[in-house]
Each structure stands twice: as structure tokens, then as C-alpha cells.
Swiss-Prot record:
Lineage: Eukaryota, Metazoa, Chordata, Craniata, Vertebrata
Keywords: Calcium, Cytoplasm, Cytoplasmic vesicle, Endoplasmic reticulum, Membrane, Metal-binding, Repeat
Matching PROSITE patterns: EF_HAND_1, EF_HAND_2
Organism field: Danio rerio (Zebrafish)
Location of region: 5 X 9 AA approximate tandem repeat of [AP]-P-G-G-P-Y-G-G-P-P: 22-91
GO biological process: COPII vesicle coating; endoplasmic reticulum to Golgi vesicle-mediated transport; neural crest cell development; neural crest formation; positive regulation of protein monoubiquitination
Region Disordered: start-end pairs: 1-97
Composition-biased stretches (Gly residues): 67-84
Binding site for Ca(2+) 1: 113, 115, 117, 119, 124
Protein name per UniProt: Peflin
One Pfam family of this chain: EF-hand_7
């Protein structure tokens, strides 16, 4: 089943915004105004959140949560391109970039589209995406992101969808770098707690520990690579939106039937 994210987008309108949350977005993780019509599963929240409101109990940001950039560990594309020497080292030509498409994203599209079909599928996307430890992105995250920007629900994206996906990755990569305090190339439990707190989520350390353990690589050291960080944060945004839709009184509490809960989860996570 395709995700509901990103349906009806018109393509990105230029370069990725530099962590600047538009005034209209009233809560953590809201999309920039006019971007793809997606109420959840969007890029990370920006520097300016606007005023406060009663959503603090489950994801409302506090005022002015600062994010920053910084040099990514690893290769020049810091986690969303192949490392130097890999099969995608030579990028495609930047000529004839369609209007509204990021030129750098176009170069990557030209290279990643290995069958020259004019579309990128999940297999091609996975071949192009690397974590900071040079491991490939997991299948779940690749499919999730592809579906977010799959306008036609065909299991693939054209150059406009890829440009939007590329911008999405840029923004989440910057968030990952910001919260990777020890520059290890991964996010541990303490760093994840800081990240989610600054994004506006009021979650217990115990829950975050369980979250990290659940999504960390089996047999690993209890840390999140970039792919899992994106997956966790995106799904958390989605479920928070589902909760918010039911919380009409903005109290931080809702009553719903078991089937309603399952419907909300299935709609957003399948």
C-alpha cells in the first residue's frame, strides 16, 4: 500500500530551505507551505517555530529550537550518495535541468537512473543511498521515502519526485549531523533524546531507549544510522499527526476505539 505522503506535489521550488520553518506550520514536523500537500512525514522542523500552544505533551516544539549544519563525516555527499570510488562517483550532466528541479539532484538522478527509464525505483534508490558507515540504506526506509514522493503510486519517481526526495534527504541529513554530538556517524540514545526534545516531543528516556533498540541494527551497539533515524522521525511525525487529528480539544489525550487506532496506524505506516 502506498503512503499518503507527498501526493499532488508540483516539484520543489529551488534549493532546500535552510532550516527555516514557515510561520504557518504550528507544530513540529509540519511541511513548508505549499510543499506537496503533505501534513506529515515532512522534513525536520526549522529554526523558527512561532508561538507555543497546548501540544507540548506530544510533539509541540518549544520556541526557537536551533539546528545547524556542519561537515558530514564520510564522503562529500555525507550519507546520501556513494562514497568516492563507488559506482556513482561520476555524476550525470547538469545540462537541460527541468524548471523547478535542483541541479545537483538532477545530476544524481541522471546517474542513479541506471536503466535510463526516466524513473527511479526502489532498487535504484537503494544503490545510491549510503549511511555514514558506508552501509546501504535499509529496504524499509527506501520504500518509505519513495512512496512519500511517488505521485502516481507506481512504485517509482520521476525527476521532479526525486528532486523533492533529494531535498528531503538534505534536510534530514543536516538534522542527523546536528544531533550527532560525538561525530560518530550514528545517533545514540542520549543524542536521540536531545533530537526529539528539540523537535518538540516530550518522550521518556525509557521510551526512547526502546525506540533506538527497536530500530538499531541487530547485533549492533544500540545506535541509529541515518536511514533508521529518518525512518523513526518520519513515522513519529506521522503518528503524532494521527493523534492530533483525534485530539480536537488539544489536551494531549484522546479516546478512540481499537479499530480507529489500527486504521490510523495502517493508513500511515503500511
Amino acid at each position: 500500500m502506498s503512503y499518503q505522503y507527498g501526493q499532488g506535489y508540483s516539484g520543489p521550488g529551488g534549493n532546500a530551505p535552510q532550516w527555516q520553518q514557515p510561520p504557518r506550520a504550528p507544530y513540529a514536523g509540519g511541511p513548508a507551505a505549499g510543499q506537496y500537500g503533505s501534513p506529515y512525514g515532512s522534513a525536520p522542523p526549522g529554526q523558527q517555530y512561532g508561538g507555543g500552544s497546548p501540544y507540548g505533551s506530544y510533539g509541540q516544539p518549544g520556541p526557537r529550537a536551533p539546528y545547524g549544519g556542519g561537515q558530514a563525516p564520510g564522503g562529500p555527499y555525507g550519507g546520501y550518495g556513494q562514497p568516492q570510488g563507488g559506482p556513482y562517483r561520476q555524476q550525470g550532466s547538469a545540462g537541460n535541468v527541468p524548471p523547478g528541479v535542483n541541479p545537483e539532484a538532477y545530476q544524481w538522478f541522471s546517474t542513479v537512473d541506471s536503466d535510463q527509464s526516466g524513473y527511479i525505483n526502489a532498487k535504484e534508490l537503494k544503490q545510491a543511498l549510503m549511511n555514514f558507515n558506508n552501509s546501504s540504506f535499509n529496504d524499509e526506509t527506501c520504500i518509505m521515502m519513495l512512496n512519500m514522493f511517488d505521485k502516481t503510486k507506481s512504485g517509482r519517481v520521476d525527476v521532479f519526485g526525486f528532486s523533492a526526495l533529494w531535498t528531503f534527504l538534505q534536510q534530514w541529513r543536516a538534522a542527523f549531523q546536528q544531533f550527532d554530538r560525538d561525530r560518530s556517524g550514528s545517533i545514540n540514545t542520549n543524542e536521540m533524546h536531545q533530537a526529539l526534545s528539540q523537535m518538540g516531543y516530550n518522550l521518556s528516556p525509557q521510551f526512547i531507549q526502546e525506540l533506538v533498540n527497536r530500530y538499531s541494527v541487530r547485533g549492533g551497539t544500540g545506535v541509529l544510522q541515518l536511514d533508521r533515524f529518518i525512518q523513526v522521525c518520519t513515522q513519529l511525525q506521522s503518528m503524532t499527526q494521527a493523534f492530533r487529528e483525534k485530539d480536537t480539544g488539544m489536551t494531549g489525550n484522546v479516546r478512540m476505539s481499537y479499530e480507529d487506532f489500527l486504521s490510523s496506524a495502517i493508513t500511515r505506516l503500511m
